[in-house]
């Protein structure tokens, strides 16, 4: 039932430039899908039971329990709660794009391709990512002294909703490295190597602690919820991590060339704090390469990086001096399609089909 508007919105978004009407339609569509969702993975197993008993679920992030309790207190049924929270999260994500100066309409079109619908399945991470993204955008673009308080508050909230949002803090690295000198950069490099080693040694325990018992592997092509992965699956994960590090680098490099600052150090490229922050978070995620040969779970960190990178990608076609390849919208649509193919194809019937073919109209209020 919703396939036609879904495909039309993606297609129309390719030709829109910061269209408020288009952005509004995407936000409403995502809210509608969230409201009508009664059959997608995790709905009846995780999210509905958690909503009905928010403080009775073991190891649930406290911020999510608070939100669920608030929704129930004001009389919302879970689907109504999910609809409102989706709309708010989409507004925050659009605000992230607006603040960093990207084409919000193209960014939302890319988001619809991937990870839009998957975000409604792994819902907490989506909400946390939207909150964290707008917090970073505010820090990067605001000149008010209170920006640090706003950023800190939003980041704490994001981490309380889903603890994987802590990875968004790596987007602050450019500012830190620019001010720390060579010694500080060595310390950061050693710290990242240590993080990689800790992940590799404790991957099984950390995957459960970070993502819960209902792990990402259920959706990423591993049968029965096992968090193992084949050699080819690990190679696929590593290639996608590398792609998401290289492509933002090339985008930043081209923008620096336009500015005439390419000959300077990376931190002096004058491309803006947001593009550099997006680049660094995706580069840092390369520490996951060893562990993604053991489990798919940690690719969910890349979801945060990809969600932010869509804002950078949507800038490229709007540059005054376009690049032959990097300013081509088809390139970024293809990247999203590749992610969608690898991470949704095997679970198409538990993600896209139930979300876009709702079987009933659930109540909005209790």
Where are these regions (language model features)?
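Membrane-interface transmembrane helices that cradle and orient dolichyl/undecaprenyl
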Residues: 132-148
């Amino acid at each position: 039932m919703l396939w036609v508007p879904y495909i039309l919105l993606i297609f129309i978004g390719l030709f829109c430039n910061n269209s408020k009407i288009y952005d509004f339609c995407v936000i409403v569509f995502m809210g509608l899908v969230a409201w009508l969702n009664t059959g997608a993975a995790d709905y009846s197993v995780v999210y509905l039971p958690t909503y009905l008993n928010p403080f009775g679920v073991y190891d649930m992030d406290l911020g999510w329990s608070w939100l669920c309790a608030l929704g129930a207190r004001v009389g919302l049924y879970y689907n109504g709660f999910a609809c409102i929270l989706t709309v708010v999260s989409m507004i925050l994500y659009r605000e992230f794009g607006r603040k960093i100066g990207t084409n919000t309409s193209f960014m939302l079109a890319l988001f619809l391709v991937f990870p839009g619908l998957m975000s409604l399945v792994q819902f907490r991470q989506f909400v946390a990512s939207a909150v964290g993204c707008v917090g970073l955008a505010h820090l990067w673009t605001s000149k008010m002294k209170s920006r640090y308080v706003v950023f800190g508050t939003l980041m704490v909230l994001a981490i309380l909703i889903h603890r994987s949002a802590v990875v968004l803090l790596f987007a602050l690295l450019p500012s830190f490295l620019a001010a720390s000198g060579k010694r500080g950069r060595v310390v950061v490099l050693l710290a990242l190597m240590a993080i990689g080693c800790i992940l590799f040694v404790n991957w099984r325990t950390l995957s459960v602690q970070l993502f819960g018992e209902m792990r990402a592997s259920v959706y990423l092509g591993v049968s029965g919820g096992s968090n193992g992965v084949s050699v080819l699956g690990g190679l696929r994960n590593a290639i996608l991590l590398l792609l998401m590090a290289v492509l933002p680098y090339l985008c930043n490099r081209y923008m620096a060339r336009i500015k005439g600052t390419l000959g300077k150090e990376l931190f002096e490229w004058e491309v803006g704090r947001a593009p550099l922050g997006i680049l660094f978070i995706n580069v840092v995620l390369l520490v996951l390469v060893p562990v993604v040969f053991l489990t798919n779970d940690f690719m969910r960190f890349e979801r945060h990086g990809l969600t932010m990178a869509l804002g950078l990608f949507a800038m490229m076609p709007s540059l005054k001096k376009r690049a032959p390849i990097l300013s081509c919208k088809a390139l970024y649509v293809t990247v999203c399609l590749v992610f969608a193919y690898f991470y949704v194809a095997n679970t198409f019937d538990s993600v896209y089909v139930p979300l876009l073919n709702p079987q009933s109209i659930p109540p909005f209020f209790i």
